[in-house]
Amino acid sequence: MAITGIFFGSDTGNTENIAKMIQKQLGKDVADVHDIAKSSKEDLEAYDILLLGIPTWYYGEAQCDWDDFFPTLEEIDFNGKLVALFGCGDQEDYAEYFCDALGTIRDIIEPRGATIVGHWPTAGYHFEASKGLADDDHFVGLAIDEDRQPELTAERVEKWVKQISEELHLDEILNA
């Protein structure tokens, strides 16, 4: 088993593709990928480092598999767990709800002890509001828009993975 668990929910395949891009950059020896629809509480509890991928649907709704998993997520003690979030949204058609699900999942795991890393700058995005903000200048995790800015996805993922690798001290952990 790898040291990092990447858990995603996806209806269109976009968030799944992002999860696999992240795994490819980290390496399969560092990160395992899991579909949240096929995951259990014990699956998440097995990792001290979690990357959670959650897309936002329509008017700020979480993807259905994550929505179904939220009661289970609320049972997990996240103390001692390092968590980075990533998610897909549409900043044009749903500008008032862009990547809201990032905030939804943060609001579940942070009070349960999760240490969240991987805040991502809002520069370069064009949206009106988001519950997925950490502050005025940062999302709580990586925000991806495959509908309006697919040409930026690979670069954003690459930079974010480098950022979280440093924040998580992955080199030190792997070389310990």
Curated annotation (Swiss-Prot):
Keywords: Electron transport, Flavoprotein, FMN, Nucleotide-binding, Transport
Coiled coil ranges: none
Keyword presence, Transport: yes
GO MF term set: electron transfer activity; FMN binding
Listed Pfam families: Flavodoxin_1 (PF00258)
Free-text comment on the cofactor: Binds 1 FMN non-covalently.
Span of domain Flavodoxin-like: 4-165
TM segment ranges: none
Cofactor: FMN
Protein residues bound to FMN: 10-15, 56-60, 90, 94-99, 147
Family: Belongs to the flavodoxin family.
Free-text note regarding domains: The structure is significantly stabilized upon cofactor binding.
Assembly description: Monomer.
Protein role: Low-potential electron donor to a number of redox enzymes (Potential). Involved in the reactivation of inactive cob(II)alamin in methionine synthase.
PANTHER family, per the entry: FLAVODOXIN 1, FLAVODOXIN 2
Protein name according to UniProt: Flavodoxin 1
Species name: Escherichia coli (strain K12)
Lineage: Bacteria, Pseudomonadati, Pseudomonadota, Gammaproteobacteria, Enterobacterales
Gene: fldA
